[in-house]
Amino acid sequence: MAEVHIIGQILKAVDFAEPHLYCKWSLQSGNAWRLVQGEVQGQSHVASHRLQSSSDFAQPLDIHLSTASVQGWPRLLVEVYAVNVLQQSWPVGYGFVHVPSTPGTHRLEIGTWKVAPNGLWQSLRERFGGGGAALSKTDLLYSGVERYKLQTLSSGKVIVELNLIFRKFDEYGVEFK
């Protein structure tokens, strides 16, 4: 079977209004893909920024996958959460990116969005640290079928650095250029 090694890190979150952030991530792929080694989901520590508009995570990724088909190519999903002084957390950004289909080093910027408040009370609650609306199903992140019904706001960006190693794809007639 062909193999993909994903080695890298979720570097940081930039341009978020909230000062204390952490990131949940997961790697989604099709049915033909199997995890050989590593973790396909995780969570970073809480990172704070005072003067910059950047929260550094340096969350390592080390995932080894095998596949019999290129269908269902992996995608990296990120959810950024804010934390207040009462240790309450709420989502401030959702986003995803497909893992590049070329080997080598890649620096990716994942644009994120959040669910827009749908009233005055929810706007006030979000502004003064009570939290915003959350998605009940994360498949709405990458499925456009139901996502178009949501009212959303642009959020910050998550910077990811990936080193990709591909093995045995040439044996299956797949060439990467």
From Swiss-Prot:
Highest taxon listed in the record's lineage: Eukaryota
Phenotype caused by lack of the gene: Simultaneous knockout of B9d2 and tctn is viable and does not show sensory behavioral defects. Males produce motile sperm and show only slightly reduced fertility. Sperm flagella show weakly ultrastructural defects including broken and disorganised structure. Length of the transition zone is decreased and recruitment of the tectonic-like complex compromised.
Keyword Transmembrane: no
Cell compartments where the protein resides: Cytoplasm, Cytoskeleton, Cilium basal body
UniProt-listed GO biological process terms: ciliary transition zone assembly; cilium assembly; sperm axoneme assembly
Tissues expressing the protein: Expressed in chordotonal neurons in the antennae (at protein level). Expressed in spermatids (at protein level).
Keywords: Cell projection, Cilium biogenesis/degradation, Cytoplasm, Cytoskeleton
Primary localization: cytoplasm
Pfam family, one: B9-C2
GO cellular component term of the entry, any: ciliary transition zone
Domain C2 B9-type: 2-118
Keyword Cytoplasm in record: yes
Protein family (similarity comment): Belongs to the B9D family.
Subunit relationships: Probable component of the tectonic-like complex (also named MKS complex), composed of B9d1, B9d2, Cc2d2a, Mks1 and tctn.
Its job: Probable component of the tectonic-like complex (also named MKS complex), a complex localized at the transition zone of primary cilia. Has a role in ciliary structure and function.
Protein name as catalogued: B9 domain-containing protein 2
Organism listed in the record: Drosophila melanogaster
Phylogenetic lineage: Eukaryota, Metazoa, Ecdysozoa, Arthropoda, Hexapoda
